[in-house]
UniProtKB/Swiss-Prot annotation:
Molecular-function GO terms, alphabetical: large ribosomal subunit rRNA binding; structural constituent of ribosome
Gene3D superfamilies: Ribosomal protein L14 (2.40.150.20)
Gene: rplN
InterPro entries reported in the protein's UniProt record: Ribosomal_uL14, Ribosomal_uL14_bac-type, Ribosomal_uL14_CS, Ribosomal_uL14_sf
UniProt-recorded name of the protein: Large ribosomal subunit protein uL14
Record organism: Rickettsia bellii (strain OSU 85-389)
Oligomeric form and interacting partners: Part of the 50S ribosomal subunit. Forms a cluster with proteins L3 and L19. In the 70S ribosome, L14 and L19 interact and together make contacts with the 16S rRNA in bridges B5 and B8.
C-alpha cells in the first residue's frame, strides 16, 4: 500500500529512477493506493538526457507493491520493491519499455498497453 511521501522506483525507460508520491487519486477517502491505482508523483532522481527531469510532476500507475495482491484462487503475489510506470496527460505510458514483471490485475484497470510493453506478466 502506497501513501503520501512513499518513495517508489520507476519501472519504465522514461529517464526517472525514483519518485515520491504526493497525492493518491480517487476521492477524499482514498488514503492508500494499491496495485493498478493512479497516483501523482514528483521526480526525485533522474538520469541525464531522459524524457523527464528532477522536480517534474506526473501521474503514475502502480505495477508492483511489497504488500502484493491476493487473487480469487487464494494465491498471493508480492514483490521486493514498490514500482510504477509514469503516465502523460492522456494517461498513456511515457516510456517505450517496462522493466520487470507486472500483474494481470492491470487488465481490469484498463492498462493493457502497459501489459503489452512489459517483459513478463504474472
Amino acid at each position: 500500500m502506497i501513501q503520501m511521501q512513499s518513495i517508489l522506483e520507476v519501472a519504465d525507460n522514461s529517464g526517472a529512477k525514483k519518485v515520491m508520491c504526493i497525492k493518491v487519486l480517487g476521492g477524499s477517502h482514498h488514503m492508500v493506493a494499491k496495485l493498478g491505482d493512479v497516483i501523482v508523483v514528483s521526480i526525485k532522481e533522474a538520469i541525464p538526457g531522459g524524457k523527464v527531469k528532477k522536480g517534474d510532476v506526473y501521474k503514475g500507475v502502480i505495477v508492483r507493491t511489497k504488500t502484493g495482491v491476493v487473487r480469487a484462487d487464494g494465491s498471493t503475489i508480492k514483490f521486493d520493491k514498490n514500482a510504477l510506470v509514469l503516465l502523460n496527460k492522456q494517461d498513456e505510458p511515457i516510456g517505450t519499455r517496462v522493466f520487470g514483471p507486472v500483474t494481470r490485475e492491470l487488465r481490469a484497470k484498463k492498462y493493457v498497453r502497459i501489459m503489452s510493453l512489459a517483459e513478463e506478466v504474472l
